[in-house]
Amino acid sequence: MLYILFRYLLWPLFMIIMRPQVYNLKGLRVKGGAIYACNHLSMLDPVMIAFLSPRIVHFMAKKELFNGLGKAFFRGLMVFPVNRHTADIASLKRAMEVLKDGKVFGIFPEGKRSVTGELDELEKGTAFLALKSGAPVIPM
């Protein structure tokens, strides 16, 4: 699995270069399905979350990334496509399956990367998933 390979090969390099400061790490150790809700300020945010989480984190990413080799690459990283321009029911169902299977789902509630560094308007997907699944939302 590409996710595991990247995580263990690149984690030491990541920790040396990025030197992340983590608060409330035990909050990430929740059992069962959980939603990691994170601000999205950098393209490296999903990588940082994956490296810092004690569990495998599943993500959605814009469907435009799933062309050609991107499809196999992102699927190997536990990422599935979402159409950000519609209410993508299939992607929400897939996220629900991840949570019902007791896994961790990472989501960026704004639905996109912030260009200003400020919090943008939140999309409804995070609240919908939390209410429908009963999974706890862990802010990061």
PLM regions and their residue ranges:
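Helix-enriched interaction subdomains in cytosolic or periplasmic regions
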Residues: M1-F6
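Soluble catalytic domains of membrane acyltransferases
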Residues: R7, I16-M140
